[in-house]
Regions:
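Generic serine detector
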Residues: 10, 22, 51-52, 69-70, ...
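Unusually extended, aromatic-enriched hydrophobic runs near protein termini
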Residues: 13, 17, 31, 122, ...
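Active-site loop/helix belt of alpha/beta enzymes
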Residues: 36-48, 94, 106-119, 126-251
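Short, intrinsically disordered, charge-balanced linker/junction segments flanking boundaries
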Residues: 255-262
Length: 262
């Protein structure tokens, strides 16, 4: 018997990208997030289906190189940055963009000799507290980048929201305000919003937005589905039933007897 199969609807992907574009200003660009094998949907297939996106975002160098080897020529941003100085010549040779947020990354950029400069995004920690340059360290970090011969000037800025899916939480508004304050004196491009921010925090659209799960037809909001937002599910999982059981009322099922027949 054939096992479970996952079917990918390319038209749904393209529809969802159109929904994204309908919610942002015409001059805001779209970075399609295809990390983690495009959320399990197939990295190369999804990237090529979303060919009208302005750029792609991945988490690891290996993902970026797979895209390049498949013929993808549009900008690719490594959201977590690089983790070894040895990666820098590879980034430069493949025209990859990278987040920078640690002292080690900054030192590597300052000390390497690269064949051509790379485009970087300064990841600012505005409240997520997972990755990023702390606000009080931002100007000093940027001053060193401004002198760095290995990066394209001007450099760009990126941050990530911690509570954008909670519309009554003031944290997102505070993050937007802090990000704007930290970057107001710099000329680079800016990116704040992922799926929840795109849908509900319109003052965070800036120069680039980063749709992730909404591209695949899912809602970032509790109690909502993608259909509620006009999105279409991209993946359908199909399999065969191996049995149909008829249970009596109050009979438990499975380990721990957690579920009881009504």
């Amino acid at each position: 018997m054939k096992g479970a199969t996952a079917q990918i609807d390319s038209q749904a992907l393209q529809h969802n990208l159109a929904v994204v574009r309908s919610q942002i200003p015409a001059n805001t660009k779209v970075v399609a997030v295809v990390k983690a094998n495009a959320y399990g949907h197939g990295l190369v297939q999804v990237a090529k289906t979303l060919s009208s996106a302005d750029a792609y975002a991945v988490a690891r160098l290996e993902e970026a190189l797979i895209l390049r080897s498949s013929g993808i020529v549009k900008p690719i941003i490594m959201l977590e940055g690089f983790f070894s100085a040895d990666h820098m010549p590879v980034l430069a040779a493949n025209n990859l963009q990278t987040a920078v947020h640690t002292e080690e990354q900054l030192q590597a950029l300052e000390q390497m000799t690269l064949p051509n400069p790379v485009t970087v995004w300064v990841k600012l920690d505005t409240g997520m507290h997972r990755l990023g340059v702390r606000p009080e360290e931002g100007d000093a970090f940027c001053a060193r980048l401004a002198k760095c011969k290995n990066i394209v000037q001007p450099f760009n800025f990126i941050t990530h929201f911690s509570c954008a899916d909670e519309l009554d939480n003031l944290a997102t508004a505070k993050q937007i305000e802090l990000f704007n304050q930290l970057t107001k004196d710099y000329p680079g491009q800016r990116s704040l919003a992922s799926s929840a921010g795109i849908m509900e925090w319109h003052d965070a659209h800036a120069d680039w937005i980063r749709p992730g799960i909404m591209l695949y037809g899912a809602s970032p909001f509790e109690g909502k589905t993608g259909i509620d937002h006009g999105l279409r599910p991209v993946m359908t999982v199909k399999t065969n039933l191996i049995a149909v059981r008829v249970l009596k009322q109050s009979e438990p099922v499975g380990y721990g007897a957690k579920w009881v027949s009504p």
